[in-house]
A protein has these predicted regions:
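Bacterial N-terminal signal peptides
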Residues: 9-22
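Sec-dependent N-terminal signal peptides
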Residues: 7-12, 526-529
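Conserved "turn/edge" positions that cap or connect secondary-structure elements
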Residues: 24-516
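Bacterial N-terminal signal peptides that target proteins for export
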Residues: 1-9, 520, 537
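Short, charged juxtamembrane terminal tails flanking transmembrane helices
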Residues: 538-542
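A short, hydrophobic C-terminal helix/tail in secreted or cell-surface proteins
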Residues: 518-536
């Protein structure tokens, strides 16, 4: 019955998106100011200082969540700037639930059970009114605060719920969590994470998930039998990052890369269905489809709501897609003629590995980066693969950057939405953050500039009284491997959320509709429909 509910609710969500598009097709353009330095912080006696610097999460209703502080710090921006503060004064802000911007957590008093924060980390906003955030509690040793993550869920009008806490009993075990690492989260608010428990070294690691409103449960644990093999799970986490190989799709599928051991240690990718069934999708040593070779290593997987996977091998020599209908299918491989281009897909370029960190949208569209080789010249590029596997280049190093008189110099990680629109950050002229920008495709696949360093951005939503500020630096959450919580600033409507710092030292969070179908203000007309969808999700336990 749960599967029927999930299918029906997914269909209803699609109808909601279609209704918004049908009513508002063609209404594009404009930038909405969500929060800005000096703006009153709702529900407090403070004003915003630094806003959104650690990334902005955007849902499919155009709502955002981010970290902000009432204070300012002077520091130099490099590539991914984040202030180091003398005091802990960060807070979590969200627009989830359609109630406007509000603060839901802050460093200091305010956690369930009268606990206090030592620090908070960037939040994720779901499509159904949930904001999920994490951080460490006061009293946890500073040396362990990185691993002593506590995951909490906020819903408008409800008391915050602790999803998992350092020191609590880990489900399906009799031991407590020693460490909880940054979670992977989907658009429905489902959560999956790596954790360590107080147990022997061969039973230390595990993966837990909370799916479809059900209780948190164990997905896999070190030392248990590894399905699809004759061995046991050996390693379930990644050295240092711990979470770059774990993903959860909007259908509740959990995909992860790990290692198993029989007579030797081998890597594999496993997929857990929403019902908890776990299967090995590909193992080192398996024949690699479309080649005469076997997998020597497998890269971290990406998963969508249909349980489809996209992944490369660890050396970035090829890219595959998996679905229950087709099995494993080769998308692209090193040495292959790049379609429509006078070059071949090449081996890894310095700092730009071919087929790195693919993105996979809800509609089955994939996005990936590739190095291209023509003669002795290597260039970077961004590609789109449609659900049938057809490839099309979106951008290339040295090609004109739309909206500028310059060319692309290098690219950030790309992301793709359910329509197949791609968005990415890139630099022009040189590698300076002063020549950084965001580009995205419109509904016709035409690449358009969203915002660039040096632009004059009107931060006042009232066009009658413009307030133009020059962008010095900006950032965009692409949901790549170093943000494997899958926080993204690009939604299925084509809206782009971003952080900008201006030459006057102020900063803000903004949502652009340059390539979107509807204006977010027009979504209000469909508010009752959206609320009914959210209400139905709650009643069915989602």
């Amino acid at each position: 019955m749960k599967g029927i509910y999930r299918w029906a609710l997914a269909a209803f969500g699609s109808m909601l998106l279609w209704s918004v598009e049908s009513c508002l097709a063609g209404a594009i353009g404009g930038v909405r100011t969500v929060a800005l330095s000096g703006m009153p912080a709702p529900g407090t006696n403070e004003t915003f200082g630094d806003v959104g610097y650690s990334g902005v999460s955007l849902n499919n209703l155009g709502e955002t969540a981010f970290i902000a502080s009432p204070s300012f710090n002077s520091y130099e921006f490099l590539f991914e700037p984040r202030p180091t503060r003398a005091i802990n004064d960060e807070s979590v802000w969200t627009e989830a639930g359609g109630s406007g911007l509000r603060r839901i957590a802050h460093e200091g008093p305010g956690l369930p059970g009268d606990a206090t924060y030592a620090n908070v980390a960037r939040p994720f906003i779901s499509d159904h009114g949930d904001t999920i955030y994490h951080g460490s509690f006061s009293g946890q040793p500073a040396a362990t605060q990185r691993s002593a993550v506590n995951i909490l869920r906020n819903r408008l009008g409800h008391t915050d719920v602790v999803v998992a806490a350092h020191g609590s009993i880990a489900p399906s075990t009799s031991v407590t969590y020693f460490e909880i690492h940054r979670p992977s989260i989907n658009a429905n608010g489902d959560v999956a994470f790596f954790g360590g428990v107080n147990a022997s070294v061969d039973k230390y690691q595990g993966i837990w998930a909370e799916v479809g409103g059900e209780a948190l449960d164990l997905v896999a644990r070190q030392g248990d039998s590894a399905p699809g093999t004759t061995g046991t799970f050996r390693d379930l986490s990644e050295l240092l990052t711990f979470d770059s190989s774990l993903a959860i799709g909007s259908g509740g599928h959990v995909a992860f890369r790990g290692a198993f051991f029989n007579d030797r240690t081998q890597g594999a990718i496993w997929l857990a269905t929403p019902t908890g069934a776990l299967q090995a999708i590909v193992r080192e040593g398996d024949v690699a489809p479309g080649t005469n070779a076997t997998f020597s290593a497998v890269g971290p997987p990406r998963v969508n709501g249909r349980g489809e996977l996209a992944y490369s091998n660890d050396s970035g020599r090829a890219l595959w897609r998996y679905s229950t209908e087709t099995g494993l299918v080769l998308i692209a491989i090193q040495g292959q003629q790049a379609p429509g281009v006078d070059a071949v897909f090449a081996s890894n370029h310095i700092n730009f590995p071919t087929f790195r960190d693919p993105a996979l949208g809800e509609g089955g569209h994939a996005a990936f980066a590739a190095s291209l080789l023509k003669g002795n010249v290597m260039t970077e590029s961004i590609w789109h693969a449609d659900p049938s596997g057809e490839l099309k280049m979106v951008a290339r190093q040295g090609a004109p950057a739309p909206g500028t008189d310059d060319v692309f110099v290098d690219f950030g990680t790309s992301t793709v939405n359910a329509r197949g629109q791609l968005a990415f950050s890139a630099r022009t002229v040189d590698f300076s953050p002063l020549h950084h920008g965001i580009w995205a495709q419109d509904r016709n696949g035409v690449l358009r500039p969203i915002v660039k360093a040096g632009d004059s951005l009107n931060v006042n939503d009232n066009p009658a009284t413009p307030d133009l500020r020059e962008v010095q630096y900006l950032s965009f959450s692409e949901g790549g491997s170093f943000g494997s919580d899958r926080i993204t600033g690009f939604n299925d409507l084509g809206q782009v959320a971003f952080f900008a710092r201006f030459t006057d030292g102020t900063s803000g969070v903004f949502v652009s509709n340059a390539v979107a179908v509807p204006e977010p203000s027009s979504i209000v007309a469909l508010g009752p429909l959206a609320l009914m969808y959210r209400s139905r999700m709650r009643r069915t336990g989602h």
